[in-house]
């Protein structure tokens, strides 16, 4: 997103509205968090810079790698020090990418402005400092605030208990300020969060206890209460827990959460991974919040797998900047879907494409229809490569016409469900989007093979453009 510079700068970072952002410049670079943690390769995780300009000679290539100084971090999500929430502040500058490490609890701050094609390490926030001042560990999602502070959801205490989770505040110099939520107002589990200031509300979601999920997924842990099924509704910016929404058995493991981008809207969605439902949340007439299942992905009956039924596992989703389309992935099934959400209560399937998954042709796992027929999905080869793993993180271009896809979820879960990723690494694909009639099609000219990295195959996770995007920027 366009940034003003110099003495004539009259606005802060980003754009005044989501629709202005849609008309922003086409992406030329994308930053990708890449992981060696958990792979058995004793190398530091790194931030990859990928060239996504089709007119460039290095299109679809990694053009720079910034290794972090430690081993075993598990870089995961990323966010900015400033975004469109600071658009009204000319002194604010989108310069630093925040990289929380999910396993080590370190937080890296990366300077992307000195050389956008070759970012450099600016600061390391050490876990001891975070724990000493807040008791928090396992940092996940970061969002910048209009105040200039940075807020990071943390999933537990240093021992991996969910009970210690909450929200970390860093100041504009990346010093630990403390917790955001008021004492006694911590959520039961932590994961993602999104705020909608005009409705004075922040809502956070629930993964599970770090002591459980860091060891891999065990269905028994769900029954033992080690995974979440709640949304936590907070007053914004005060940090008071006002309401807890129990999503019940239809909302097990609610992960990514997004409001509609239009800041006047009082509705959004959360992707519930295990039950594979997109749940819509909304404000009611009395000012409280409620929820309903908006999209349901039925589990597939399968043969030759660990269970007789396979959930889709919705692990990521996003909403186009004009709030017309919602996109989500089914990490285990292997498809990416596009829904028209112009009527948010009634999403309509507009596009679907298979780009991996456990039931693709050539896999030992087969799906079984109700009448007993078996089938497997057709997955295209791209530049001679058969897609590995399943679609996991996604990022959409500002104009809504290109969707980028990586395939690593979390190293221990990758090893459990897609062991070939450990041996062959991740990749990144690009899907062309029809925004008029709907439809998704794999771009045959784009394939980034993180299996061919100089230090060995790595796992690619979240993607960010230098100028912000539909999953980093919040309008006030």
Roles of regions detected by a PLM:
Residues 2-11, 19-127, 160-163, 171-174, 183-345:
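Beta-propeller domains
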Residues 265-283, 307-421, 426:
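Loop/turn-rich, solvent-exposed surfaces of beta-rich toroidal or solenoidal domains
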């Amino acid at each position: 997103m366009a940034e003003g510079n110099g003495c004539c700068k009259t606005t802060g970072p980003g754009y005044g509205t989501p629709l202005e952002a849609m008309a922003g410049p086409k992406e030329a670079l994308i930053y990708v968090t890449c992981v060696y943690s958990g792979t058995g390769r004793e190398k530091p995780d790194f931030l990859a810079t990928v060239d996504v300009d089709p007119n460039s000679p290095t299109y679809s290539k990694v053009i720079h790698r910034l290794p972090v100084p430690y081993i075993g971090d598990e870089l995961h999500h990323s966010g900015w020090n400033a975004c469109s929430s600071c658009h009204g502040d000319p002194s604010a500058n989108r310069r630093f990418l925040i990289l929380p490490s999910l396993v080590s609890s370190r937080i890296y701050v990366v300077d992307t402005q000195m050389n956008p094609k070759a970012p450099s390490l600016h600061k390391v926030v050490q876990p001891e400092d975070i724990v000493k001042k807040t008791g928090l560990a396992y940092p996940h999602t970061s969002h910048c605030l209009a105040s200039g502070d940075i807020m990071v959801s943390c999933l537990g205490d240093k021992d991996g208990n969910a009970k210690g989770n909450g929200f970390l505040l860093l100041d504009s110099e990346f010093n630990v300020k403390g917790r955001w939520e008021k004492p006694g107002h911590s959520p039961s589990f932590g994961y993602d969060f999104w705020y909608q200031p005009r409705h004075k509300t922040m809502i956070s979601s629930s993964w599970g206890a770090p002591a459980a999920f860091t060891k891999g997924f065990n269905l028994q842990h769900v029954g033992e209460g080690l995974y979440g099924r709640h949304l936590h509704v907070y007053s914004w910016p005060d940090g008071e827990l006002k309401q807890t929404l129990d999503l019940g058995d239809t909302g097990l493991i609610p992960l990514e959460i997004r409001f509609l981008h239009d800041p006047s809207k009082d509705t959004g969605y959360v992707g519930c991974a295990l039950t594979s439902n997109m749940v819509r949340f909304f404000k009611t007439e009395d000012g409280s919040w409620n929820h309903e299942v908006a999209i349901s992905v039925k589990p597939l009956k399968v043969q030759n797998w660990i269970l007789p039924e396979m959930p889709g596992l919705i692990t990521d989703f996003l909403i186009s900047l004009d709030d017309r389309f919602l996109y989500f992935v089914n990490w285990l099934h292997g498809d990416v879907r596009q829904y028209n959400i112009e009527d948010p209560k009634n999403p309509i399937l507009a596009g679907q494409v298979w780009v991996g998954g456990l039931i693709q042709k050539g896999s030992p796992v087969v799906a079984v229809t109700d009448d007993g027929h078996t089938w497997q999905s057709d997955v295209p080869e791209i530049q001679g490569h058969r897609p590995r793993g399943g679609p996991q993180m996604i990022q959409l271009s500002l104009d809504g016409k290109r969707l980028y896809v990586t395939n690593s979820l979390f190293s221990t879960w990758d090893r459990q469900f897609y062991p070939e990723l450990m041996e062959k690494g991740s990749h990144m694909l690009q899907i062309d989007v029809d925004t008029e009639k709907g439809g998704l099609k794999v771009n045959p000219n784009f394939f980034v093979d993180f299996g061919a990295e100089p230090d060995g195959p790595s796992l690619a996770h979240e993607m960010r453009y230098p100028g912000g995007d539909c999953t980093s920027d919040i309008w006030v």
